[in-house]
């Protein structure tokens, strides 16, 4: 992705994530207007999942997922993170691996970033480690399709059974 603008990198990540979700047999919806915190909606039937797409960098054995956005104001930069009122999940795409990873908002809300480990740490730390494979898009969607509970089904506005039945 060398030489691409940030917008082009974001568009490439969205396209790769959209393709991966469609290959899993799901429908992807795109908002007609800009300005929302989510990039895509994944139809899990009957639930809708608001997804923020991210391009991730690999540094050694770690995927670094940035979860903070910034904008410049007259008073300086303003940094914001994501919440369950805005999105239901972050899907991070790694062009180096050509794979996507789904992170429920319950695990990343308010955070500046998350590291997903691809290989064990050199210091053998295992406590608090997020293994990338545990968050693979295929595995996470498979759990959701099999009716297994996951934190992301209990978070966010569109995942509320009351709101789904009222649509």
Placement of each model-derived feature along the sequence:
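Acidic-basic catalytic patches of nuclease active cores, encompassing PD-(D/E)XK
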Residues: 1-29
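Conserved functional hotspots at enzyme active or ligand-binding sites that engage polyanionic ligands
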Residues: 20-22, 49, 65-82, 118-125, ...
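Short beta-strand or tight-loop elements
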Residues: 24, 36, 86
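Catalytic phosphate/metal-binding cores of nucleic-acid and nucleotide-processing enzymes, i.e., regions
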Residues: 31-35
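Catalytic cores of nucleic-acid endonucleases
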Residues: 54-100
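Non-catalytic C-terminal interaction segments of nucleic acid-processing enzymes
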Residues: 97, 101-167
């Amino acid at each position: 992705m060398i030489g691409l603008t940030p917008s082009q990198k974001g568009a490439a990540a969205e396209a790769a994530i959209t393709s991966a979700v469609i290959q899993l047999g799901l429908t992807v919806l795109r908002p007609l207007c800009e300005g929302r915190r989510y990039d895509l909606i994944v139809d899990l039937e009957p639930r809708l999942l608001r997804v923020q797409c991210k391009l991730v960098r690999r540094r050694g054995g770690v995927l670094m997922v940035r979860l903070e956005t910034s904008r410049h104001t007259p008073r300086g930069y303003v940094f914001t993170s994501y919440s369950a009122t805005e999105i239901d999940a972050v899907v991070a795409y790694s062009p180096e691996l050509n794979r996507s990873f789904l992170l429920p908002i319950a695990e990343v809300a308010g955070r500046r970033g998350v590291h997903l480990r691809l290989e064990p740490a050199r210091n053998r730390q295992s406590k608090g480690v997020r293994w990338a494979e545990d968050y693979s898009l295929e595995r996470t969607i498979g759990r959701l399709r099999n009716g297994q509970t996951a934190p992301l089904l209990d978070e966010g506005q569109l995942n509320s059974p009351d709101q789904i039945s009222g649509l």
